[in-house]
Structures are given as C-alpha cells and as structure tokens.
Amino acid sequence: MEHPLEIYNTLHRKKERFEPIHKPHVGLYVCGPTVYGDAHLGHARPAITFDLLYRYLRHLGYQVRYVRNITDVGHLEHDADEGEDKIAKKARLEQLEPMEVVQYYLTRYRHAMEALNVLPPSIEPMASGHIIEQIELVKQILKAGYAYESCGSVYFDVEKYNQDHRYGVLSGRNIEEMINNTRRLDGQDEKRNGVDFALWKAAQPEHIMRWPSPWGMGFPGWHCECTAMGRKYLGEEFDIHGGGMDLVFPHHECEIAQAVASQGHPIVRYWMHNNMITINGQKMGKSLGNFITLEEFFSGAHPSLNKAYSPMTIRFFILGAHYRGTVDFSNEALEAAEKGLERLLDAAALLDGLKTADTTSVEVGDLRKRCYDAMNDDLNSPMVIAALFDAARAINAVHNGQGTITSSNLEELRTTFRLFLFDLLGMRDERASSAGGSEAFGKAMDLLLSIRAEAKARKDWATSDKIRDELTALGFTIKDTKDGAEWKLN
C-alpha cells in the first residue's frame, strides 16, 4: 500500500497518520449503549462504524484489543447530574429489578449486533462491575486537588482544573462563557459552579442502585466509567477512543479532564466520532421519541416504514455514507441501499462461474489500490462501494459475453471483491440463509434445475414448466441461458 492509514482526530480537527503507541498492539475503546430500551438505528451507526475500523485494523496486521462498555448505572436523564437513573426509572415503571432490565435489553442488543454482522468486542465491561475502579479514580482526582466533596457527593472542579490545563480542548467550548451561562441558569446548589460535573452522587435510602464509598452511599457519575474501564483494560495511554458525535460534550470532554487530573497526562491519542442518524432533520434518539428500533426495521412493524429491511440492508445503508457525515432516514434511501447491495451480491455470486480467456478486455488492475486508498483515507466506505460497483459492471460484462478476462485477472477480481465486500465491509448474503441454509440450499436448487433440464431434454414440457412456475411463485427468478438455467431469490 502506498498510503498509510489516516484517521480524523477530533482532538486536532484534522486527519492524522495512524501510528500506534505500542505497535503492533492497538487499544480501541468505544462507548457502548445505556441498556434501558431496544437498540435503534442511532445505536447501529457507531457499532457498524467502529466494527469497520476494527476489521480493517486487524486486516492490516494489528493485534487489537477492542473494549466496548455497557452503561448499566449512573446515566441520569438528559445526561445531567440531577434526576433519575435511566435504568432505575425503567425498572420502577416495569416493577423489575434494575439488572433484570439490563439483562433483557443487553441480550436483545447483542442479538441485533449479531444480525448486523458486528463482530463482538474483545471485552465488554459493565459499569456496575467496576465500582471499585471508579471510586479509586474519584479518590485520585480529589487527592490532586481537582474535586471537592459536597453533601455526600463529589464534584469535579472545572474552574480549578482550567487554571492548570484546558477544559474544552476537545469540544472547543469557552470555559468563561459556560460558567457565566450556568450561573444564570442554575443558581446555587451543591456545586461551586454549574459547569462542575458529578464524579460521585449521594443516594437516598430509597435509591435502588447505590454502593458504599468513602463519601457515603451513592453511585458513580456517568463520565467516570469510561475513564476507569479504559484505563483498566487498555492502560494509562491508549490509541483510539470512539463514539457518537453527541458524546464530544460533555461526556468525552469530561473523560479527558478526569484522566489528566488523575494521572497528569491524557489517556487517548486519537478521538474518533461518527455523525448522527437524522429523521426529518432531527437527531434520531430515545430522548426525542422519534426513533425506530432495529427490530422494527427488521420486521417492518413501524408506521414510518414501507416494508421490512434486512440487517444487511441497514448495514449497507449506514456504510453508504462516510461515518463523519449525517445520514437522513427515508424509505427511498433504504430501498436504494437494498437494490445496490443486491447488485453487488449478484456480482459476487457470478465470480465462481466466470469463464476465462487468453486475453482480457476488463481492467481490474487498480481495483485493489482504489479500495485500499479509500479505506486509508479515514475509512471512506462510500468510495470503496463505488469501486466495487465498477467491479460489478466488469463482472456482469464478462458474464454476459460482452468482455473477456484472464485467469490471473479473475483471481485478482475474486480476491479483492470478496475481501472488501465481505471481510471488511462485513456484508453477507442473507438470501440463501433466510431460505433455510446456504450450501445445502444451493445444491437443492441445482438439483431441481437439473431435473428440469432433463425434462426439457425429453421434451416433457409439462414437468419443465411446472418446476419453473412453482419456483417463480415461491419468489425465485429462473433465467435460461446458453450455459443452462440460473436462479436467484427475489
């Protein structure tokens, strides 16, 4: 490859060459879901984005430890320091234990990720399983002088921290403006400044989720878990931290401050953020009530959907846009993605049957380079897909007798097409598996068509037509060619 991998670092607002701290090892941390409801399209985007990164880093030969956390405590409503824990509220409404809620939705989240062909992370730590580490983090920040205790809670002193470091380095926010605005809005409470954020919150006896600490019974602030767990599993400095763009502030800004305050230096080298999924121009999310769950996409059971969309259609739809660009939901866009993916899968299915010649009229020499150049340019998946569409046209041309290809060029085409479509973009052909098995299903179809061919040879048109008509009624397209019959599932 002529060009090394470059990724956009939100911290410096530019693309930078990726250079691991401890090559060939790479530490990757991605913020996972707060599990109090079914996963929706907005959850699918970061999962698929960083699955693409994970796959590509491994393909490049790196040994990747991928940590994606599960938030099951401390995430209050509206991402605030006051209010009710999202999971505790769900548990109260449904008259369940909080961990019942967590287990139910976490299981459903994992099933959805499996359907989307998202590889499981190396480690999937849960916030509630790392209370000791979070308490230790808070103690370190207190000892360094960047936090204070108030009414049994502990808050990060943003103004004090900003005197020695810079709060706002990731988001670009101005600390003076933030302090002035929060003073006008919040008035006086437990905090010295409204911009200060909770490291540990005191909990009343009726609070369902609470733990003992040096400051009394309580629970950790939302921002603590990622700093504590990232450091535990990836060390005091690791390569990449990813998440949705909506986490830049306050979550990731607070993570940076916590790390610097507790250990004297930043913990992350590259910050990567995917953009939002929008619906009618607004961010799709639970807080706005405008979300469509992944299960609803898969089943079509939502009034905004014209039909059901397969998991691979959803994955292809998301990868059809660059991860830093917005993606606006529409049925038209999903249907276009569905048709585009089908074209590529059809082309992939033709690869094994293409006949070679001594000469080639199809140019495939730069296909691999185009795909690698696109991936190395900040994971430019739309450009990879564009190159694959060009390759699909070449495959179809050879298949239709409008071009020729040598055996060496065909092997290059097969290897590159399958590497980028299946191994890296993570697509899989659901059509055969959804009909009850892939290889066995294909062999059964070939057997049926061979019986039909024998019937035609005997001029048994009734049997031949019956097989064709019955298969058509079941949703298959049967096409007779000079080399025999071909089939596909519509």
Swiss-Prot record:
Keyword Zinc: yes
Positions that bind ATP: K286
Catalytic activity: tRNA(Cys) + L-cysteine + ATP = L-cysteinyl-tRNA(Cys) + AMP + diphosphate
GO cellular component: cytosol
Subcellular localization(s) per the UniProt record: Cytoplasm
Cofactor details (free text): Binds 1 zinc ion per subunit.
Gene3D superfamilies in UniProt: Cysteine-tRNA ligase, C-terminal anti-codon recognition domain, HUPs
GO MF annotations, alphabetized: ATP binding; cysteine-tRNA ligase activity; zinc ion binding
UniProt cross-references to InterPro entries, sorted A to Z: Cys-tRNA-ligase (IPR015803), Cys-tRNA-synt_Ia_DALR (IPR015273), Cys-tRNA/MSH_ligase (IPR024909), CysS_C (IPR056411), Rossmann-like_a/b/a_fold (IPR014729), tRNA-synt_1_cat_dom (IPR032678), tRNAsynth_Ia_anticodon-bd (IPR009080)
Keyword Transcription regulation among record annotations: no
EC number of the protein: 6.1.1.16
Cofactor: Zn(2+)
Binding positions for Zn(2+) per the UniProt entry: C31, C226, H251, E255
Motif mapping: 'HIGH' region: 33-43
Motif 'KMSKS' region location, chain numbering: 283-287
Signal peptide: none
Gene Ontology BP term (one): cysteinyl-tRNA aminoacylation
Any Pfam family: CysS_C
Keywords (A to Z) from UniProt: Aminoacyl-tRNA synthetase, ATP-binding, Cytoplasm, Ligase, Metal-binding, Nucleotide-binding, Protein biosynthesis, Zinc
Uppermost EC category: ligase
Oligomeric form and interacting partners: Monomer.
NCBIfam families cross-referenced by the UniProt entry: cysS
Family affiliation: Belongs to the class-I aminoacyl-tRNA synthetase family.
Annotated protein name in UniProt: Cysteine--tRNA ligase
Name of the coding gene: cysS
